Amino acid sequence: MSTNKVRRLVALAARWNGPISVAVKVISIQDFREFQSLLHAHQEHLKKVAFHLYFESRHRDYPNNILRNLALDRVQSDYFALFDVDLLPSPMNTHQHLRSTFDDNPQLEDRLKDKTVFILPAWEIEEEISNEDITIQHPLYPETKEMVLKMNGEKMSDRKLRIFRHVFEPGHRSTDYPKWTSNNTDISYPIEAEEYGYEPYIIGAMKDAPRFFRDFRGYGFNKLSYYVELHYAKYSMEVLRDFFIFHVNHPSTYGEERTKSRMVNMVCVKTFMEYLARDYGAGYLDDEEEVAGLETWRRRMAQGQGTGDYYEEAEEEEEDESEDEDE
């Protein structure tokens, strides 16, 4: 995460009420001092948070996957929950509630150990809330599944909550929200990633879990590449029926810089595909090995002119929505 996201982390830590491993990008001594001051002011809610600092100047694109790996590598438990600092759990979806659910349903833990990841359905609040206005409790927060169903009313005009993320629906659509809202399933239900772009928030086992492909920076492909790798590593996906997280919406920072970093990452796709072929024997040119939407990757890969370091040629800026906390 960036140092300006401390208020969001405080809300997350207070509601999660369990161990968190978070990697923080620091760009200067002044940035570090301001970060220290914020931590001191909010220390009451950050006692279970382990901070791992990554120092890098602003001139390069935001190191999304480097930070994710830094946090993930320092998780002390057998399992992890992976989500961004802009997402919050409800009081019924805390660390303790998840542990109790897995203790009461040992088959879930068995599946975790057998290369299954469990998906936490993600929603987002329609109304934007700035960093300065983030609080632990808020009238707009859905605190139960019943509230989610009510806030996501049948009439569009009545909706205060929507499926995450409306600006890129393939990112979470494979979660099968109609099935989740029906409540007519077992404690979890299996799904398939049926379209390009699926990048849910998950619970997984630390043992042998892949790491994020570190070459991707800034906007585009950085988190998505992880789920492509899970596919080739033969992981299964299941959705937890009684759990959810929600995105606290904020003003968009999309602009020309993001477009440029997306173009830079298109070049990295070629390197990523070579890695999949080498480590997994991924026949990414064979139809029978096709992952959903991989033709899109192949087309973008063809636009790359090599695998050199193109970062210095781009006007780079931090990517605001790429911070991860792990159980």
Where do the language-model regions lie?
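Catalytic donor-sugar/metal-binding loop of nucleotide-sugar-dependent glycosyltransferases
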Residues: H231-I245
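Short active-site alpha-helical segment characteristic of glycosyltransferases
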Residues: Y226, L230
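N-terminal anchoring/stem segment of glycosyltransferases
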Residues: M1-H59
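Short aromatic/hydrophobic "clamp" motif used to bind/position activated sugar donors
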Residues: F80
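Acidic, Ser/Thr-interspersed intrinsically disordered low-complexity regions
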Residues: Y310-E327
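Conserved catalytic core of nucleotide-sugar-dependent glycosyltransferases
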Residues: R58-H59, P63, L67-R68, L72-D73, ...
